[in-house]
């Protein structure tokens, strides 16, 4: 049986998925990873637990199909350090919408 080298990868990079950030908990920076199945305009936004928008990491930029990594440095849209706590990161790519929680610990 023929086995492709990428058969051992846990995620098919051509499926829509929002993965766990790494590290989590984090301080001062974390990586947010996602994969999309086709070229899409992507939005990736960070919210606090009150639902307030904290930071926009991607605002409608076009991404190709595959696996992508975006860094967040724990700063809000004004460049200020955000306090310790739980944050939600939400992706929208075409009709795909997903969110996950992450924990910033100082």
Give the location of each predicted region:
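Glycine-centered coil/turn sites that cap beta-strands in beta-rich domains
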Residues: 6-22, 26-47, 56-59, 69-72, ...
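Short, surface-exposed loop/turn motifs with a glycine/proline- and acidic-biased composition
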Residues: 58-94
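Extracellular and select intracellular beta-sandwich modules with Ser/Thr-enriched
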Residues: 96-100
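Short beta-strand edge segments in extracellular beta-sheet folds
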Residues: 102-106
